Amino acid sequence: MTNGPRVVYAVVKLGGGLLGRNGAFERVTGALAAFGAGRPLLVVPGGGPFAEVVRERSRHLQIDADTAHWMAILGMDQYAHVLACRIRRAALVERERDIPVALAAGRIPVLAPYHWLRAADPLPHSWDVTSDSIAAWLAGALGAARLILLKPVAGDPVKLADPYFPRALPPGVACQVVAPDDLEALDRALGDGGSHEG
């Protein structure tokens, strides 16, 4: 059971670990452009190197958990700008109401989540909560049927995601991890959700 009415069929979270991995980022963004067109999905960024800087420097800077949490989410916003630039037909969105507008215009919405999460503040402020748990919460909030985590390797999402993830993933949301070496799995995972316009 998800939290709200269905806004998208699938939430696709693109992990920052794909950056700099032998063309993985290029393959994944190309696949999203090809497979995502005309399908009711939302792309959610990982924190990538932007959030990793916060993690690495938070102790040195002597910032508290709340500050680090919001700075890391701002890192997700930065990665969202990269994805919106690199995924063909993507549109950067910041709030739930922007998503159906982008979809209606034939665009692939990429969420910069800071404003939405700052208003809702749904998750603990801890490094046990990463973009995986944020994507899981968003899947529930949007009534999505599927959550797809794009990561360097495939496997059990509970083992590959952050410690809070099992609590963040709503019942009834099917979760799958897809790796860049099997992007046909992404097409299959999105296949039930809407038309494919190529």
Say what each PLM segment does.
Residues M1-G193:
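Nucleotide/pyrophosphate-binding catalytic subdomain
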